[in-house]
């Protein structure tokens, strides 16, 4: 019998799929909702996982606040075991030019932060207690690290900083676990084969594919399988019970960037996000 449900965004491939695989393998009591933009790919992922009775595929487009709201309503009305874990994993990079969501928000910020903000705040009261929320960020979130990236990729790193600011502000609003919800940020490391380079120009995709085998020897580089196992553990493993308001690099809690602890910026981000959501009716 399934005694808990974990909702994972972006679960049709890459880190999200590996997180679902690890979670299903580690504990037979969990049901997994694959929250995906493309239901056909979600169903293919469910078939690959080989656990059709322990998985559900639900559609959500994080580039549309209306889609997120519809998803939340679907989750609330679908007979599922109590929702005890929410993994905010889906993300994208826009590597050339600028794109916008259905709601007129810059795409990288809209999907990586605002869509998940709408999801978390919409579903929060529906989570069974105790519950855990894990927000996937990135080591690139630190603005003090001058990467030399052009503007489009800087938008990605800024969105990852937003993920950490959001995590810490949410933890404060949940009284650091006193309300029964633990929330942490997660850096999976660099993951060759994760699909994040899918929007690169062809020459860069080729270079990335050729270099990937050599990158695997570096300490901050992990396979999606290993990072998926770490992410699943943070979402459901008993050893992380009660752990909240932390930033994890793999399985280890570390300090995030200095700017990510700026409470004024976190509050401004929260209030700006609320205003943006309020504009969508």
Q: What is each of the regions a protein language model found here?
A:
Residues 102-105, 116, 227, 266, ...:
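Amphipathic alpha-helical segments in well-structured domains
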Residues 258-281:
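C-terminal amphipathic/interface module of NAD(P)-dependent oxidoreductases
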